[in-house]
């Protein structure tokens, strides 16, 4: 059982990372967006230097929170979570995925490469959100693997949906500038497939997840 203080501190750390990633994502050298959540993005309201430093501070705050004994008395579990977060944000996770996002602009990219990019820049963080409480609760490797796998499919579907919303929603709905992916030549699944094919793809991915985790789902949730 996880105490409220444990999961609240993990939540604070995750939100710090989320906010850092959005601030840096909006920078002129990245996605160059003037708005976030219906308000001026950090670099527009203040300046680019402040935005970079604010993002850096929020990034570091997450590790400060997770390393504190208040998060959990077991140093081993805290180290495991910190290690997991470091991998999530590094070259095989968020940072690597964002670099691919920039590299793939105005290029014809295969579906498999786009999905890999989605998983790196989005799914890895979703997986961390799912795995961290399992680590704190001292769950076994199979249970942690299930949590990771769930985060992967959840993050993938979220990113696909986010790209679709960018195409057909307005500023009021999104809280940011719509249609930027197409204008910037972003490689997205919707740039390769129509809506019906994307729906089929998503349903197949869900089915794969269910098949991989069928025994766990039946044992623990039915």
Q: Can you describe what each PLM-predicted range is?
A:
Residues 1-214, 220-221:
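Mg2+-dependent prenyl diphosphate-binding active-site environment of isoprenoid biosynthetic enzymes
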